Curated annotation (Swiss-Prot):
NCBIfam families assigned: bioH (TIGR01738), PRK10349.1 (NF007674)
UniProt enzyme class: hydrolase
Subunit record text: Monomer.
Annotated ranges, domain AB hydrolase-1: 15-242
Name of the protein described by the UniProt record: Pimeloyl-[acyl-carrier protein] methyl ester esterase
Pathway: Cofactor biosynthesis; biotin biosynthesis
Family annotation (InterPro entries): AB_hydrolase_1, AB_hydrolase_fold, BioH, Carboxylesterase_BioH
UniProt catalytic activity: 6-carboxyhexanoyl-[ACP] methyl ester + H2O = 6-carboxyhexanoyl-[ACP] + methanol + H(+)
Cystines in this chain: none
Positions contributing to substrate binding: W22, S82, L83, F143, L144, A145, L146, Q147, H235
Taxonomic source organism: Salmonella arizonae (strain ATCC BAA-731 / CDC346-86 / RSK2980)
Active site (catalytic residues): S82 (nucleophile), D207, H235
Length: 256
């Protein structure tokens, strides 16, 4: 079996595993790497099939998490952005003893809209899957543009995300489809009631993919977790608001 690409950076006395979102790779953290590296030892990963972690096909959430867990430190804060938030959450469910704290960023335990639950309409996700096979690069570009929509630095942020994608070879369509399937079908709302490590959820007020309306719903469902909404951010708050993002993580570390 192939190994996933993994880089350690920084010299902080606390390990922080960073998991990127759909279609991207670990270069997405470049803008905050220096700042976070002074507080943490960072573990930068390309998820299986993405970036430099080549040779993997489509995976289920469980398979992806098991692959990442193989190389992970014994104890770390696990932070996942968007799709990566589901991987970090799954890690907290299957290996709670290895997760010092769980952080999800612009992520949802259930990305798909359901009755009484805001999210992405299932037909929109299905449409993305269809479009992937028709016009692969255009579809990824559209998805990236959606992530920064509404922020004061939207164009610049979208360019940053696009440069991250272009920095590595594009994931296979099969891998991207598998990621969309996870976003379309996974629902961790009930399972995550049982986690008892510190749990921080960060949202962007302007996020068009993960509606801020889920924050109060999850405050009620998971009273053991805390949420923070970054006011002028969209789906990539660590790019548009790096200072607020890094401050939230430094505060979490000092509370452990």
């Amino acid at each position: 079996m192939n190994d996933i690409w993994w880089q350690t950076y920084g010299e902080g006395n606390c390990h922080l595993v960073l998991l990127h979102g759909w279609g991207l790779n670990a270069e997405v953290w470049h803008c905050i790497r220096e700042e976070l590296g002074s507080h943490f030892t960072l573990h930068l990963i390309d998820l299986p099939g993405y970036g430099r972690s080549t040779g993997f096909g489509a995976m289920t959430l469980e398979e992806m998490t098991a692959q990442v867990a193989k190389n992970a430190p014994d104890q770390a804060i696990w932070l996942g952005w968007s799709l990566g938030g589901l991987v970090a959450s799954q890690m907290a469910l299957i290996h709670p003893e290895r997760v010092q704290a769980l952080v999800t960023v612009a992520s949802s335990p259930c990305f798909s809209a359901r009755e009484g639950w805001p999210g992405i309409k299932p037909e929109v996700l299905a449409g993305f899957q269809q479009q992937l096979s028709d016009d692969f690069e255009r579809t990824v570009e559209r998805f990236l543009a959606l992530q920064t929509l509404g922020t004061e630095t939207a164009r610049q942020d979208a360019r940053t995300l696009k440069s991250v994608v272009l920095a590595q070879s594009m994931p296979d369509v099969e891998v991207l489809n598998g990621g969309l399937e996870i976003l379309k079908t996974v629902d961790l709302r009930e399972p995550l009631k049982s986690v008892n490590m510190p749990f921080l959820r960060l949202y962007g007020y302007l996020d068009g993919l993960v509606p801020r309306k889920i924050a109060p719903l999850l405050d009620t469902l998971w009273p053991h977790s805390t949420s923070q909404i970054i006011v002028k951010a969209a789906h990539a708050p660590f790019i548009s608001h790096p200072a607020a993002f890094c401050q939230a993580l430094a505060a979490l570390k000092s509370s452990l």
